[in-house]
């Protein structure tokens, strides 16, 4: 999302279409973000500061080469034979073994027992 300025002297047309100045994109100034010990990093995209965490879509083939900790939000996905576990648990275990912080939501206890098994290095490929 980009914030833009409206053209000076122009009003918003009746049908809801607006006129804007595309060359005048509003960028957040550095003064918005503290640079002392209270603001070392932020968890929001589209800023120049190094992010601590960023909530994004992740899948097993996603390349994480920028040293950003990935948070797997609601990463639940029914039974895969070798582990006798649901695909949801396999997906959760996969993310945990990759070092991703997983925020799982479930009211079913068996769907969050992710520490009772481990994936092999071959499974992780």
From Swiss-Prot:
PTM (free text): The N-terminus is blocked.
Gene3D superfamilies per UniProt: NADP-dependent oxidoreductase domain (3.20.20.100)
Means of activity regulation: Strongly inhibited by sulfhydryl reagents and quercetin, but not by pyrazole, barbital and indomethacine.
Listed GO MF terms: aldo-keto reductase (NADPH) activity; morphine 6-dehydrogenase activity
Alphabetical list of SUPFAM superfamilies matching this protein: NAD(P)-linked oxidoreductase
Keywords: Alkaloid metabolism, Cytoplasm, NAD, NADP, Oxidoreductase
Binding, NADP(+): 9-18, 74-111
Its EC number(s): 1.1.1.218
GO biological process, one term: alkaloid metabolic process
Cross-referenced InterPro entries: AKR (IPR020471), NADP_OxRdtase_dom_sf (IPR036812)
Catalytic reaction(s) noted: morphine + NAD(+) = morphinone + NADH + H(+); morphine + NADP(+) = morphinone + NADPH + H(+)
Protein family: Belongs to the aldo/keto reductase family.
PANTHER family, sorted: 2,5-DIKETO-D-GLUCONIC ACID REDUCTASE, NADP-DEPENDENT OXIDOREDUCTASE DOMAIN-CONTAINING PROTEIN
Assembly, per entry: Monomer.
Protein name: Morphine 6-dehydrogenase
Lineage: Eukaryota, Metazoa, Chordata, Craniata, Vertebrata
